[in-house]
Amino acid sequence: MNYEKIDSTIPGPGISETDWNDVFEGCNCEAECSSAAGCSCLINKIDNYTVDGKINKSSELLIECSDQCACILLPTSCRNRVVQCGPQKKLEIFSTCEMAKGFGVRAGEQIAAGEFVCEYAGECIGEQEVERRCREFRGDDNYTLTLKEFFGGKPVKTFVDPRLRGNIGRFLNHSCEPNCEIILARLGRMIPAAGIFAKRDIVRGEELCYDYGHSAIEGENRKLCLCKSEKCRKYLPMSATPIE
């Protein structure tokens, strides 16, 4: 576990200062930030979160309020700030006692469906840096998370690597039947953050997992999946190239 701990994703090699500082214009809310109040950060005219902080999956583009917003001066906490506030639930790193699986994360208390677990935080890096690190750490576990989106019909990829700098999110294991999922959130800037939310109610002591995605690897290079769920696909999802 030799890495630098950070609270949220930071810019790394391959990400220009201009791209990282491409921020949204903030809202001018003087009261609660909600769709009913006309908060400009809620561009879908739908609240991103319920009053008790659960994710509203009807929101197609999740933009949280930020330091550019007038609501930062409000005496009460803005309802449209969840991912940026970090984990609010007790999370525990533990040894899974399986050498191939290593460490994992479990719930230290009950987590309700839709509640925020943690961000998958690391360095936001460029494609060339992804490929360079893949060569440098060849044979080691690959921590890089590829966030895939489409804008104007064109694919856009964001790479988050917590190998050197990261948070507890780097320890969440894969499951073919996960209790968590990744939802992209924009925390005042165009570059998204990876928020991990509970897909269903989770009991204390239960391991937290999300689905790493579909595999593009066939044959001998595949690794066995150890999730032990009834829907197990037998092999871990793996990309054919570092930037997929």
UniProtKB/Swiss-Prot annotation:
Residues 25-86 form the Pre-SET domain. S-adenosyl-L-methionine binds at residues 101-103, 141, 143, 170, 173-174. Residues 221-237 form the Post-SET domain. Zn(2+) 3 binds at residues 33, 65, 71, 78. Zn(2+) 4 binds at residues 176, 225, 227, 232. GO terms for cellular component: chromosome; nucleus. Zn(2+) 2 binds at residues 27, 41, 65, 69. InterPro entries: H3K9_Histone-Lys_N-MTase, Post-SET_dom, Pre-SET_dom, SET_dom, SET_dom_sf. It holds the Pfam family SET. Its main location: nucleus. GO terms for molecular function: double-stranded DNA binding; histone methyltransferase activity; zinc ion binding. GO terms for biological process: methylation. SMART domains: SET (SM00317). Residues 89-213 form the SET domain. Its EC number is 2.1.1.-. It is an enzyme of class 2 (transferase). PANTHER family: HISTONE-LYSINE N-METHYLTRANSFERASE SET-23 (PTHR46223:SF3), HISTONE-LYSINE N-METHYLTRANSFERASE SUV39H (PTHR46223). This is Probable histone-lysine N-methyltransferase set-23. It comes from Caenorhabditis elegans. The gene is set-23.
